[in-house]
Regions:
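Short hydrophobic core segments
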Residues: 8, 81, 98-108, 228-238, ...
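Conserved beta-strand-loop-beta-strand element in the redox core of flavoprotein oxidoreductases
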Residues: 84-98, 212-227
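FAD-site-proximal beta/loop scaffold in flavoenzymes
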Residues: 120-143, 219-221, 227-299
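Rossmann-like dinucleotide-binding cores of NAD(P)H-dependent redox enzymes
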Residues: 60, 154-210, 290, 308-324
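A conserved beta-strand/loop element that lines the FAD pocket in flavoprotein oxidoreductases
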Residues: 68-85, 198-208
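Mid-to-C-terminal Rossmann-like scaffold of FAD/NAD(P)H-dependent oxidoreductases
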Residues: 2-3, 10, 276-370
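Beta1-alpha1 glycine-rich phosphate/pyrophosphate-binding loop at the start
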Residues: 2-73, 161-182
Length: 384
């Protein structure tokens, strides 16, 4: 009996691949292993659940049992893969060995955790999956006071969603303005002003010194001397590609699991997909590249090697208070050129040669997306 194609991870990447494989091959044996409950949901919905009027259960699009029936797959939930043996085409779940024909790592990314001190350091929550979100919602009282650590994409999206629905939100970040890695200062300030209009308070240019429990609340001591009293602390300081399993198996890892143009790792018949991937020296930490990757990887797994191409894919930041669209520039020397009047701003990032390699649009300027996308280089162009 042929060993199944095995996918580690049941997030958007893993399930999208399983769907495409099943579409292309109705009888193919497919096994999916996941550490969580296996229910499928759309991860970007986590940071706009209040706006959608949904709790954690309401975010489920397909239950694990429905996935098994719809896709005719073996889906093992609450299952942790502890070891990969690429040479043997085998993985281990504790002391149980499972053979595979081809293996796909769709392990995603894990939250970066700040080293914190104080009696409430262990009370900090992160939201990286639906079960995390359930714990976060359970911790929120009505009209909660929430401190968000991090003014990046996830921090700003949660700030918008929470503040727009009656919660008192404060955001702390070492940076001088929101989305500092994605926006020039003028646009970051426009976003800051819009979120301030919802009641969001900002503590920028400062870090967190300690967190302590006082009564039923948490007191955050900021590095600038300010004290903030809140009910809940949410850490949104970023994600790190989940590479441990691959690294322990001897696969090449750097920022992520290193893959070639066909998404194969340094080991034969082992591939990677989604947030854990590094291709051409870059991570692909957003949802849109997954569709392109799957369209290449599925036929590759079925015997038709196909290279993945990733064109420019602007990211929609879910901050309705200030609509924002970003095509992040690569890590190259250059600078932003900004035009317009806040909040309706257009920004182009040009490299040292003057070539446009990124853009950002805020407010009404987001309507000009189609003007900018054709000017952008691909995120990754496979070798000829």
């Amino acid at each position: 009996m042929t060993a199944p194609i095995t996918i580690i991870g049941s997030g958007h990447a893993g399930i999208t691949l399983a769907r495409e494989l099943r579409r292309l091959s109705p009888e193919l044996p497919i096994r999916v292993l996941t550490r969580d409950d296996g229910h499928y949901y759309y991860k970007p919905d986590l940071s706009k659940a209040f706006a959608a009027g949904k709790d954690a259960e309401g975010l489920i699009k397909s239950t694990a049992e429905q996935l098994r029936e719809q896709l005719k797959i073996e889906l093992r939930c609450r299952t942790t893969v502890t070891r990969i043996e690429p040479a043997a085409h085998r993985i281990w779940v504790g002391d149980q060995a499972l053979d595979y024909s081809k293996l796909v790592l769709a392990t995603g990314a894990t939250p970066i955790r700040l080293p914190l001190s104080g009696s409430a350091a262990d009370a900090v929550l992160t939201v990286n999956d639906r079960e995390d979100y359930a714990r976060f919602r359970a911790a929120l009282p009505d009209k909660a006071r929430v401190l968000i650590l991090g003014a990046g994409l996830i921090g700003c999206e949660f700030a918008n969603d929470l503040a727009a629905h009656g919660h008192a939100v404060q955001v702390a970040d070492l940076a001088g303005w929101p989305l500092p890695r994605l926006l020039p200062e003028a646009q970051g300030r426009a976003l800051q002003t819009a979120l301030s209009g919802l009641g969001v308070q900002w503590h920028l240019g400062t870090g967190l010194a300690s967190l302590d429990r006082e009564g039923g609340a948490i007191t955050a001591q900021l590095a600038n001397g300010q004290r903030v009293v809140v009910d809940v602390v949410l850490s949104a300081v970023g994600l790190r590609a989940a590479t441990a399993l691959a690294s322990e198996a001897g696969l090449t890892t750097r920022l992520g699991v290193v893959v070639d143009d066909r998404l194969q790792t340094s080991a034969a018949d082992v591939y990677a997909l989604g947030d854990c991937v590094e291709i051409g020296g870059r991570l692909l930490p957003y949802i849109l590249p997954i569709a392109n990757a799957v369209k290449a990887l599925a036929p590759t797994l079925l015997g038709t090697p196909t290279k993945a191409r990733f064109p420019a894919m602007p990211v929609i930041v879910k901050t309705p208070a200030c609509p924002t669209l970003v095509n992040p520039p690569p890590a190259v020397e250059g600078g932003w050129e900004v035009t317009g009047t806040a909040p309706d701003l257009e920004a182009v990032f040009k490299d040292a040669s003057g070539r446009p390699v990124g853009f950002a649009l805020t407010g009404k300027a987001t309507a000009k997306r189609a003007d900018y996308v054709p000017l952008m280089p691909a995120i990754h162009e496979p070798a000829a």
